[in-house]
A protein has these predicted regions:
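Generic hydrophobic alpha-helical segments
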Residues: 40, 63-66, 115, 141, ...
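Phosphate-binding glycine-rich loop
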Residues: 30-77, 91-95, 101, 167
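PLP-dependent aminotransferase-like
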Residues: 68-156, 163
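Conserved active-site segment immediately N-terminal to the catalytic lysine
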Residues: 154-181
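N-terminal "arm"/small-domain region of PLP-dependent enzymes with the aminotransferase-like
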Residues: 1-30, 35
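PLP-dependent aminotransferase class I/II
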Residues: 8, 20, 35-43, 47-53, ...
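Structured loop/turn residues at beta-strand edges in well-structured enzyme cores
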Residues: 20, 48, 73, 121, ...
Length: 181
């Protein structure tokens, strides 16, 4: 078997730092919330050039929370791409909304030339999924979101550090949702 990632080699390099950080969290009794979360949120949002950063359990939770914050639910439709993982769709369904799927372009990302055909009066949001370190064509997505007054929630689970025209993943739409997948 060919390993894609040899995490043991990386772990050995970082072992002392990892164990020290875990030990500090447990000694301080701040496993949930606390100064390490505050530090992470600050550093993560600064890196992505965003005003806020809120740590949650995973990208599914982040997308669900974002959709609910925009009052998206039963009877609403959310457009995403057909080439996504189950968690993206799970987040949409968790709100009671229906997912509508736009096909992909030659780069395996949302085909923005087909996007407008899926927008109707029930559409409330677009969830573009940035994949493989590549970002969707955000100019067109943002143009359509303004035209139809839609929210844009970027699924950035596989695009940490990616950029589109100098802007980082998660910093273009209304909300960017990440994971450490």
């Amino acid at each position: 078997m060919i390993k894609v990632w040899d995490y043991l080699k990386e772990y050995e390099l970082l072992r002392e730092d990892i164990l020290s950080a875990v030990d500090e969290v447990f000694k301080n009794g701040t496993l949930i919330f606390g100064p390490k979360l505050d530090e992470f949120e600050e550093k993560f949002s600064t890196y992505h050039e965003c005003k806020y950063g809120i740590g949650v359990g995973n990208c599914t939770d982040a997308i669900t929370i974002a959709l609910k914050a925009f009052d998206i639910g039963a009877g609403d439709e959310v457009i995403t791409t057909s080439n996504t993982a189950v968690p993206t769709v799970t987040a949409i369904v968790n709100t009671g909304a229906s997912a509508k799927f736009v096909d992909i372009n030659q780069y395996s990302l949302m085909d923005v030339d087909r996007l407008e055909n899926f927008i109707n009066k029930k559409t409330k949001a677009i969830v573009p999924v940035h994949l493989y370190g590549q970002m969707c064509e955000m100019d067109k997505i943002m143009e359509l979101s303004k035209k139809y007054n839609l929210k844009v929630i970027e699924d950035c689970a596989q695009s940490l550090g990616a950029t589109y025209k100098g802007k980082k993943a998660g910093s273009i739409g209304d909300v960017g949702c990440f994971s450490f997948y």
